[in-house]
């Protein structure tokens, strides 16, 4: 028998050396050598060959050059040569030319706010000398000869030597990153780096149309970029990007000078709906400085997503001018980003103008004509229950029995062209912005390839996939829409069977699954007027009240509405980030997510949606929270019957005028014209709502179901699908089909 105490003692002895913590002296802080500091800084400023070209070209522009030539070898690693015809560099300035923080652009920090030049830090040339071999040849106006000098680690390797030169400056950067082995190994794709240099100079050429640019590979005769001085910016775009781009551009201008301090001018060119490209090209200059702005790019892409066909991307050139004190240019080592005062307002105004311009120009489109050879289509299926099967060549095709013959095809249903004949409403709804109306005509997109990183969302998606019913999935993928049987059920055909399908249940499940799969990747529907949460929630509470005449409950309803409003305000950041449900600081709802790109939910159900978020979501547990919010969104976006009764059949009585005079007249005459006794405005709204719902069910819901829906096993038994007929049984009764 083993003694427990001795065993415990032995274990403690074995573990004690591992748990002993040896005191350690804190490391000594040392001052880095200046050469180390300079090399680290050089790696930040000159990140790849295109960074060096950008700095050198900007220096040439600061020198009032009218012609700039760039020669590149091995993507810029072997050689970068930039020549210009600017004012040159004085002989007495050459000794300190490549020292850090030496510049002719400013003398004190306050000069940053009135700076008109590209460079200002005095770091670019210095950084190049720490990671490459730099040679400068220059001559100023009036000099008899020029000077050439080489630099290394910020200092001259020798005194300037007299040489023959043409007006301006030529800077050669050789063996870039020769002393940074890791950086050099990551830049072995010379074609990629040269492409970035060509793209940079192309962008520069269309903005600085008063300067001639050229770029070619070392030893090449033909230049890959060659622009000439042109009075028209559109001509510059045509010469650089080609006629196919220039002919599809529209001019756009925006300006603002309000009392709040948002002052700017923007002019540029944007592509129309006939332009087709696979990548967005945004050429953005702010105060004549080439920069990037991801927020502006994203805002423009959202507008174009509603108008461009397929996955096409736009071409956009914009030049924005602001007061120099409104721009902070000193926020990035390579100066590719700037910070703007009132940036969000500026982006919103530009986005609105682009949207208006596109909407006004979207009346006509150009399509390529192509001859179509009509061939006989055959239906093939590998399923055992399919009435038609594919036979090897050379064998006689077996005749399909008449009682199993299917004349429909789910991939080419009858009436598919109706999707392009959606009637436009006479007036836009007040609750949804015009952008969402434009977006409603967009064809179905695929879900984002990136999935959410959160394990809770991945578990929810995995749960949806694991509960999928294979038989129901096959039915959903290959069914054909027949028509609406009533307000809730649609008739669908699958092979030789006819089913009733509950469109409310199907759409609710589809929207729930889409919310999970598009988690944190939503586009947004902008409401034209922000809606106060408290009023909407209070309205939902009153609609649920079974005793509306009881005023004693009003205080309780108001308190519940206030509590839910505060709760949603508290969760606003999470709702915005993950679900694109935007609630501002004043507790107003201003944006909703796009679950299906062709579909806008019934805005009359917003109060019910907000109340559901407040009452039915378990906010404390992450997985339960995301599931509850997704379920609430799924129920809100589900294709419920409109609140107005269906005017077909008995529902028409709801729209009768209830005026006393008309009722008396009806009683007296007995045969008054029914049309004269109807509220035509209300009837028209109802007819439009029901027609829009049926169109959405046929052309949005069912195509999206075939792409995205994973029907759960519960749908096989809860009445979502009900089999009503089959060709085999009908043939037994009628002996014909």
From Swiss-Prot:
Top-level lineage group: Eukaryota
Primary localisation category: nucleus
Keywords: DNA damage, DNA repair, Nucleus
Deletion phenotype: Reduced fertility and mitotic defects: 72 per cent reduction in homologous somatic recombination.
Gene Ontology CC: chromatin; mismatch repair complex; nucleus
Region (Disordered): 1-21, 378-416
Localization per Swiss-Prot or TrEMBL: Nucleus
Molecular function via GO: ATP binding; ATP hydrolysis activity; ATP-dependent DNA damage sensor activity; mismatched DNA binding
Biased composition range(s): Polar residues: 378-400
Classification via Pfam families: DNA_mis_repair (PF01119), HATPase_c_3 (PF13589), Mlh1_C (PF16413)
GO biological process: fruit development; mismatch repair; mitotic recombination; pollen development; seed development; seed germination
Entry comment describing in which tissues the protein is expressed: Ubiquitous.
Sequence similarity: Belongs to the DNA mismatch repair MutL/HexB family.
Role, per record: Involved in DNA mismatch repair (MMR), correcting insertion-deletion loops (IDLs) resulting from DNA replication, DNA damage or from recombination events between non-identical sequences during meiosis. Component of the MutLbeta heterodimer, which probably forms a ternary complex with the MutSbeta heterodimer that initially recognizes the DNA mismatches. This complex is thought to be responsible for directing the downstream MMR events, including strand discrimination, excision, and resynthesis.
UniProt subunit comment: Heterodimer of MLH1 and PMS1, called MutLalpha, which is the major MMR MutL activity correcting base-base mismatches as well as IDLs. The heterodimer binds double strand DNA independently of a mismatch with positive cooperativity and has more than one DNA binding site. Heterodimer of MLH1 and MLH3, called MutLbeta, which is involved in correction of a specific subset of IDLs when associated with MutSbeta.
Name of the molecule in the record: DNA mismatch repair protein MLH1
Species assigned in the record: Arabidopsis thaliana
């Amino acid at each position: 028998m083993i003694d427990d105490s001795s065993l415990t003692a032995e274990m403690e002895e074995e573990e004690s050396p591992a748990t002993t913590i040896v005191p350690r002296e804190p490391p000594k802080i040392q001052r880095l050598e200046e050469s180390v500091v300079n090399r680290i800084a050089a790696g930040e400023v000159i990140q790849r060959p295109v960074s060096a070209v950008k700095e050198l070209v900007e220096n040439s522009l600061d020198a009032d050059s009218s012609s700039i030539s760039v020669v590149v070898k091995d993507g810029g690693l072997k050689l970068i040569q930039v020549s210009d015809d600017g004012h040159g560099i004085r002989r007495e300035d050459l000794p300190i030319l490549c020292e850090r923080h030496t510049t002719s652009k400013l003398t004190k920090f306050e000069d940053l706010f009135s700076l008109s030049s590209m460079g200002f830090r005095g770091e670019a040339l210095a950084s190049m000398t720490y990671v490459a071999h730099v040679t400068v040849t220059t001559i100023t106006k009036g000099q008899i000869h020029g000077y050439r000098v080489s630099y290394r680690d910020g200092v001259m390797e020798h005194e300037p030597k007299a040489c023959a030169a043409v007006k301006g400056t030529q800077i050669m950067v050789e063996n870039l990153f020769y002393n940074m082995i890791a950086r050099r190994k990551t830049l072995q794709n010379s074609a990629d780096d040269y492409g970035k240099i060509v793209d940079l100079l192309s962008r520069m050429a269309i903005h600085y149309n008063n300067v001639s640019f050229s770029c070619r590979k070392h030893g090449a005769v033909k230049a890959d970029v060659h622009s000439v001085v042109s009075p028209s910016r559109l001509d510059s775009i045509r010469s650089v990007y080609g006629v196919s781009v220039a002919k599809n551009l529209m001019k756009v201008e925006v300006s603002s000078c309000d009392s709040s301090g948002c002052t700017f001018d923007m002019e540029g060119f944007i592509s129309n709906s006939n332009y087709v490209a696979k990548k967005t090209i945004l050429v953005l200059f702010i105060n004549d400085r080439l920069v990037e702005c991801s927020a502006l790019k994203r805002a423009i892409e959202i507008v174009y997503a509603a108008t461009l066909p397929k996955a096409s991307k736009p071409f956009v050139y914009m030049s924005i001018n602001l007061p120099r004190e409104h721009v902070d240019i000193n926020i990035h080592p390579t100066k590719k980003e700037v910070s703007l005062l009132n940036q969000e307002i500026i982006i919103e105004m530009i986005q609105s103008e682009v949207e208006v311009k596109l909407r006004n120009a979207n009346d006509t489109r150009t399509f390529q004509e192509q001859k179509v050879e009509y061939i006989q289509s055959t239906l093939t299926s590998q399923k055992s229950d399919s009435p038609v099967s594919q036979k090897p060549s050379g064998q006689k095709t077996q005749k399909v029995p008449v009682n199993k013959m299917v004349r429909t095809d789910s991939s080419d249903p009858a009436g598919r062209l109706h999707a392009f004949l959606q009637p436009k409403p006479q007036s836009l709804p007040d609750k949804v912005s015009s952008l969402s109306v434009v977006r409603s005509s967009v064809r179905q997109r695929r879900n984002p390839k990136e999935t959410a990183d959160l394990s809770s969302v991945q578990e929810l998606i995995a749960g949806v996939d694991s509960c999928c019913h294979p038989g129901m999935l096959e039915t959903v993928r290959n069914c054909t829409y027949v028509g609406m049987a009533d307000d809730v059920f649609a008739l669908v055909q699958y092979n030789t069977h006819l089913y009733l399908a509950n469109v409310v249940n199907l759409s609710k499940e589809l929207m729930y699954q889409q919310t999970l799969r598009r988690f944190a990747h939503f586009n947004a529907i902008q409401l034209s007027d922000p809606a106060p949460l408290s009023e909407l929630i209070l309205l939902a509470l009153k609609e649920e009240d079974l005793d509306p005449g009881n005023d004693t409950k009003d205080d309780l309803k108001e308190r519940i509405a206030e509590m839910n409003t505060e709760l949603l305000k508290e969760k606003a950041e999470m709702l915005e980030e993950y679900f694109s449900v935007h609630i501002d600081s004043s507790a107003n709802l201003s944006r909703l997510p796009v679950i299906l790109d062709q579909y806008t939910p019934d805005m009359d159900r917003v109060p019910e949606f907000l109340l559901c978020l407040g009452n039915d979501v378990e906010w404390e547990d992450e997985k339960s929270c995301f599931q509850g919010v997704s379920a609430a969104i799924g129920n809100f976006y589900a294709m419920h019957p409109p609140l107005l009764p269906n005017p077909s059949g008995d529902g028409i009585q709801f729209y009768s005028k209830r005026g006393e005079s008309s009722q008396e007249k009806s009683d007296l005459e007995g045969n008054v014209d029914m049309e004269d006794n109807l509220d035509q405005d209300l009837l028209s709204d109802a007819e439009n709502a029901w027609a829009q719902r049926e169109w959405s069910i046929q052309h949005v819901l069912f195509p999206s179901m075939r792409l995205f829906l994973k029907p759960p096993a519960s749908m096989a038994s809860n009445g979502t699908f009900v089999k009503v007929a089959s060709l085999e049984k009908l043939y037994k009764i009628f002996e014909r089909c």
